[in-house]
Every structure is written in C-alpha cells, then in structure tokens.
C-alpha cells in the first residue's frame, strides 16, 4: 500500500485531465467561478468517481467484499474525526489543489506543469488532507458495507470537506491574486 503505487495514479489522471482541458472541482474552487458552475462540476466530478466504483461492485467478484470493507473502515475512521478537522483538512487540500492547477496553467512547459500537479498531490496525500471528490469514490465503494445511517453521516462529512476544499481554493486566490491586484 505505498503512496506511489496506490494513490499516484490519481496524480497522473489529474495531469491527463488538465492536459485535455478538463475541469476539476478542487481546481476551480479558487477561480472566479459562478456557484452554479461550481455545483455542476462538483456533481459531474462526483459521478466520475461514483459510477466506476458502483460498476466495480458487479465486475470484481473476488475481493469486492474485502475492498468494500476496507473502504468502509476508512470512511468510518474519518467519521471519528472532529468536523472541524474535516473542514481544515479539506481547506488544506483546496489550497494544494489550487496551487496544482495554477502551477500547471502558469508553467513554462508541460514538464513543469506536471511537476506542479504531482508535487501538490503528493503533498495532500502524504499530509492526509481531505479531497471531497476522492471521498465520494471511497464512499461509493464502501456502500455495500455500511448502514443507511452511516452512509448519510459520510455524505454530511463529504459536504463539510467540500466546503473546506472551496474555502482553501478561495483563500489561495485571495493571497496570490486578489491582494496583488489590490496593491497594484
């Protein structure tokens, strides 16, 4: 279960999405994005993680129960955290994902852009910060192993994390862009 073999494919996927002009929820949180578009991207990105997880229920016969139980244990562990921790961990993820997307967009070439993305993603994974879209995928995998009440609690937790992701992106925009424009 090393970070590089299990979680780094997410970093590669983010690079692919950005390279092909895709929109990432945590990447646009800090941009001047209308709330309606932000909500729409949240739903679409969430579906992009939830649908493959649900499909995996029927396609992975051996190990599906074990995978679901592991994902459930992860989600229940997160539920044991203080809601302020969810918000702050979401905020820090939002900061790093904003830096990833801005770093990618402002990079002088693709190699530097990819390095910015991978640096930010490794940072939020190693630090244990919370990413609302990723947590939707974990929840979808865990659903067969959770009670209805636990699913509702996880959904509430993901909403708090999502707010943290948004606040983190907005905070970085204030620090890096808005204050500079104000001083100019």
Region locations from a protein language model:
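Alpha-helical transmembrane segments and their helix-helix packing motifs
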Residues: 1-184
